[in-house]
A protein has these predicted regions:
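Core-facing hydrophobic residues within beta-strands of well-ordered domains
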Residues: 20-21, 147
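Short beta-strand/loop motif that positions the catalytic acidic residue
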Residues: 117, 123-125, 129
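Hydrolases whose catalytic domains are alpha/beta-hydrolase-1, hotdog thioesterase
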Residues: 8-12
Length: 177
């Protein structure tokens, strides 16, 4: 699961482990994780910056502001437009608000006992995630017994999109192992 989807994936792995053969958590963190409850203020400021600069907010939310990060943001947004038919619609404003509310609530929860997750787990993130701070990926890894951690350099919340080819190769190898 990516981001909020990673929260859901952790819940499933804890509550119905028989349904999960392998777990991949990206750009996510544990309940009560450091800084997760700050997503509201981080997101709004960067969404406003996107409006002011006439740029997609993903430039600021998912990628670093280095030349490498911005090049990756351009490439990612271009890839998103490649699919011409049956494209998913973006979230409505009310759905986006509900997502932020759910992420904030997750960040304020009591931590769960992730040592109960016995499923082999691949955890990936960028080294500069400002939405779900990177320290939370390391925190998950320390608490889940069977884990592999990938932290991409000069990458943010969208690290798996920035280094997509490398991530897919590693994810497939993990799933095949």
């Amino acid at each position: 699961g990516f981001s909020l989807g990673g929260f859901v994936a952790q819940e499933i792995a804890l509550k119905a482990p028989e349904l999960v053969r392998k777990l991949i958590l990206t750009g996510t963190g544990p309940a009560g994780g450091q800084g997760i409850d700050k997503v509201w203020s981080v997101s709004w400021l960067l969404m406003l910056k996107g409006l002011i600069t006439f740029r997609d907010p993903k430039f600021y939310l998912f990628f670093t502001q280095s030349a490498n990060g911005q090049k990756a943001a351009h490439a990612f947004l271009k890839r998103l437009k490649e699919r011409k038919k049956e494209r998913d619609k973006g979230p409505t404003p009310s759905a986006f608000l509900r997502q932020l509310k759910a992420i904030t609530a997750w960040g304020r929860q009591m931590p769960q006992d992730l040592s109960l997750i016995k499923t082999p787990t691949l955890i990936a993130n960028g080294d500069s995630d400002i939405m779900v701070p990177t320290v939370n990926s390391s925190g998950c890894a320390r608490r889940i017994p069977d884990w592999k951690l990938i932290i991409d350099e000069d990458a943010g919340h969208g690290g798996i999109f920035q280094y997509h080819a490398d991530f897919v190769t590693k994810a497939l190898a993990f799933l095949d192992s």
